[in-house]
Amino acid sequence: MFLITFSKAGQEDIVLTEDDLFDFQYEASCYSGESFELGGVNAKTLYLLIDNNTQRFSRGTFANCRVKLEIDGKFFGYYNTELPKRRNGVIELTAYDDMVKLDTEFPTDYTFPQTFWAVYAQCVFEAGLASEVSFDNVVLNGVWDNGIISADYTQYIYANSCRNLVAGMAEWNGGFAYINDVNKLQIDKFSKTVTREYSSGDLMELDYSDETVVFSKVKTSQKNKTYEMGTDAGYTLVLKNQYISYGLDDTMFETYLTKISEYYTVFELTPMSFTLAEPDFDLHVGDRIQVYDEEEQVAITGNVSKIAISGNCSMTVTCGGFENVSSSSGFTPTSYSQIQQSKQEAKGDGTAEKLQTTGSK
C-alpha cells in the first residue's frame, strides 16, 4: 500500500493512496549508466499520475510541496515536487529527494586546507539541509573515511557546485553519496559481503551477463599525469573526478589511491537485472546480493545499482557492470526508463486504470 503525504505552508496535508493514482514509479540508484563507477550522487525519484477527473484538486495544489512516501508502512524518504502538469483529468507530478538541493554554489571565500568531512558538512549547510555546519550531519562509511584537500588548485573547487564536490569526494572515499532515512548526507562503499540471497524461483524475471567483471587495476589522473595500480589481468576501475585530485598533495594522493586499489582489486560483480515476485523493501542500493539460477545451477553475485518500484508494487533490481561486458555477452541492460514509458503511455487518450498493489506484502 502506498501512502503519499503532501505538505505545504498554508494548506492542510493531502494524503493519497494507490486508489488516487493512475501510475506510480519510484527509483533509487547510485550511478547514472550501466557501467560500475564511484562517486554517484543520484537523487531518488518519485513519479505520479494523479486522478483528477472530478477536478477535486485545484491548480497549485501540489506545487512546491514537501512529499513523504511510505510503502507498506515503511518510510521511503522526503521529496520536493517539480511544477505539475495537467491534462485530461490527470495530474502528472515528478519529485526528487534532497540530493537536488546540493545543486548550489560552493562559497568562494571558504579557506583550505580542509578535511573531506568538513567540506561535506559545509555542502550540507550551503544546501539548506542543516541549520549549522556540523560533522553530525554527515555519515561516512567509505573504503576509508575523511581525507584532506590542500590549499593548492582550489580554483577548481570553487568553480563547482556542492553536488559536484560531494561526487568528487565520495569517489575518492571509494563510494557513492545519498540522502539517508534521517535526511543526512551519507557516503557508502559498495559492500563485499552478501546480505541477500535469492533463487530464480523467487523471481519473475532474471537476465544476467555471461561474463563476470573482475577489477585488477585502478587508474586516475592528476595534474596531466596518469597513475595506475594493479595489472592488466582484468578490468580497470577509473577515477574520473580530477578537480578533487588536483587538491590532494602528492603523498595523500598516493595514499588514497592505494586504499581504493586495495579494496576494489579482485572485486567481482556480474551485471544482472531481475524482478522480485515479492518486494524486498529492506534491500538497498549498494548492497551485495547473490542469485542462484536453478536451471543453470550457477550462483551469480553483484552489487545493487538501481531499485525501481512500480504501481503494482513490483520491484525490479539492477546490478550494473560495464557497458562492454553487457554488449559482448548479450546482457540486456535496464537503462530504459520506466518513468519515461509511463509518461508516453499517459499521453494517450486519457483513459487509464487505477493502480492495483497485488504484489505488496
PLM segments and residue spans:
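Acidic, low-complexity/disordered segments
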Residues: M1-D13, N88, E92-Y96, L102-T111, ...
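Assembly/oligomerization scaffold segments
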Residues: M1-T111, Q122, Y153-Y158, V166-G174, ...
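Glycine-centered flexibility motif
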Residues: S29-G33, R66-K68, D72-G73, G77, ...
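Short secondary-structure boundary/capping segments within folded domains
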Residues: S35-G40, T258-I260, T318
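Charged- and aromatic-enriched interaction segments used to assemble
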Residues: K85-D210, L355
